[in-house]
Structures are given as C-alpha cells and as structure tokens.
Amino acid sequence: MTGSIWAGSIWAIVPAAGRGTRFGGPLPKQYLQAGGQPLMAYTLMALAAHPALAGIVVAIAPDDADWPGWTAVQSKPVLTCLGGATRAASVLAGVLALPESVRADDFVLVHDAARPNLALADLDRLLEIGRGDPVGAILAAPVRDTLKRAGDDGGIDGTEPRERLWRALTPQLFRRHQLIRGLTEASAAGVDVTDEAMAMERMGLRPLLVEGAEDNFKVTTPADLARFEFELARRGIAVDADALEAPAVNAQSNARNVATQLATVSHGNDAT
C-alpha cells in the first residue's frame, strides 16, 4: 500500500455546501441517513482509512445546521471552512483553508461528500499512479453503454463512439498550486467547472485516468440511496461512531466558527 511510503502526507477536500436539489427532501443529501449514520460519515471514513491521509477539510454552507461538528475521524483532523455558491468555489475555499504545512506543490485529494462507497484499493491506486505524474490523476470508469446523440425533436441523430470515453469519478488528485490557479482562472472567466480535472484541462494540462470501481457512485436520487443501503447490508459495513470525534457544541455554533472567514453565499444548486 502506498500509504506506508507517504504516511500522513495527503490532505483531502470534501465540498459539502450543496443542497442536493435533485434528490428532494429537507436534508442535503450528504446528511441523509444510511445504516444509522449520515452518508458523509462513510465518505470521511473511507478517506481516513488510507494511511497516507493527513486530514480533511470539509466546506460547508454558512447556514448549515446539520453539520455534526466532527473534529476528527480515526484520529485524523477534520477542519471546516465556508463553501461557496458552486462546487468549484467550495473546493477553492477548502484548498485555501489547508494548514500552512501543506506546500504549494503538495498533492491534494478532492472527493464528493455524497460518494460514500469509495474502495480503499481504488484510493491506493489513485495515489500510487497520480503522485507519479506531474499533473495528477482522477478515478474514472470507462463508458460501457451505447451512447446516442439526440436531436431537438427527441429523435436519435446518431451513435457516438465510446471507445475513448470515461465517466469522471472522485477522488481527484492535483497539486495545491495548480488547483488554486485552475479554479481561480475558471471563475474569472465565468466558467463553471463541474470537476477539478476540467479546471486542469482549461490550463492545457492532461491528468491521468485511473480506472475505479463502478460502485463508487454518487448518491443523487432515492434509488442511489437504496443501492448504498443494500451495499451496506450485503457487505456488513458499519461506521464506528467512536472514530468520529465532535465537541459538545451545537452544529449551528460550529458552522459559525469555521476555519476560514471567506465571504460567501450558500449553494443554490446541486453542486456537491
């Protein structure tokens, strides 16, 4: 495992300021319950399970009353910062909130809050391959279905070749200074990048694709939640509540006392 070489050397950013409007319901999807715990508990535990992980920065909405106030997971620090109006803004806020010990050329992971089924083997492979590349890498899955191009009338205009198409997953691994530059330049140009690799692409960089498991899915619909609950039951997965540390303060108080004081607005879309 790569963690034996790079133990405690990687920080992760988890953008969690979105409302998950596609899912519906009163709770943001990252706080939906599965197996008695919020989805994000499984997400953070999956990241913290790798020995290379040093800590996690979670970007939350300014009005987030649901954040449990976790300060550590598996004894690894969890910091919080205020997220922005888009996923990209939240990721940038998280990168800027990293501890001073994280250098400009250090690699940083970015992982979706509502992608709780990350396999340790996939994370290990991403770190091993990505850290050997000057740009970085992302987990991805080859497109296996036949793709159709639709016309304005809903009819099929043609079939798209799929041989070189991949679905972008997370985590994604990039150097801190390149994340800052890429996300800042995209924002200045008015471009809403939907993942960090897109920001790298805009700078003419070519991250590597690292094949990951198909079941590293993002929970965006009730069917996705049911699928994850099935996976929990099938594999007998449970979160050790003692591994998630939180102070005895309410969530709203914790949200006000976040690590950075960036002036932002909460998400108005499904940007996590």
From Swiss-Prot:
InterPro entries according to UniProt: IspD, IspD/TarI, IspD/TarI_cytidylyltransf_bact, ISPD_synthase_CS, Nucleotide-diphossugar_trans
The EC number(s) this enzyme carries: 2.7.7.60
Enzyme class: transferase
Marked site (Transition state stabilizer) residue numbers: 22, 29
Site label Positions MEP for the nucleophilic attack, positions: 162, 218
Pathway: Isoprenoid biosynthesis; isopentenyl diphosphate biosynthesis via DXP pathway; isopentenyl diphosphate from 1-deoxy-D-xylulose 5-phosphate: step 2/6
GO molecular function ontology, one term from the record: 2-C-methyl-D-erythritol 4-phosphate cytidylyltransferase activity
Catalyses which reaction(s): 2-C-methyl-D-erythritol 4-phosphate + CTP + H(+) = 4-CDP-2-C-methyl-D-erythritol + diphosphate
Alphabetic keyword roster: Isoprene biosynthesis, Nucleotidyltransferase, Transferase
Coiled coil, from the record: none
Record flagged with keyword Transferase: yes
Family annotation (Gene3D superfamilies): Spore Coat Polysaccharide Biosynthesis Protein SpsA, Chain A
A biological process term (GO) from this entry: isopentenyl diphosphate biosynthetic process, methylerythritol 4-phosphate pathway
Disulfide bonds: none
Highest taxon of source: Bacteria
Keyword Magnesium tagged: no
Family assignment from sequence similarity: Belongs to the IspD/TarI cytidylyltransferase family. IspD subfamily.
NCBIfam families: ispD (TIGR00453)
Function: Catalyzes the formation of 4-diphosphocytidyl-2-C-methyl-D-erythritol from CTP and 2-C-methyl-D-erythritol 4-phosphate (MEP).
Name the UniProt record assigns to this protein: 2-C-methyl-D-erythritol 4-phosphate cytidylyltransferase
Organism whose genome encodes this protein: Xanthomonas oryzae pv. oryzae (strain MAFF 311018)
Gene from which this protein is expressed: ispD
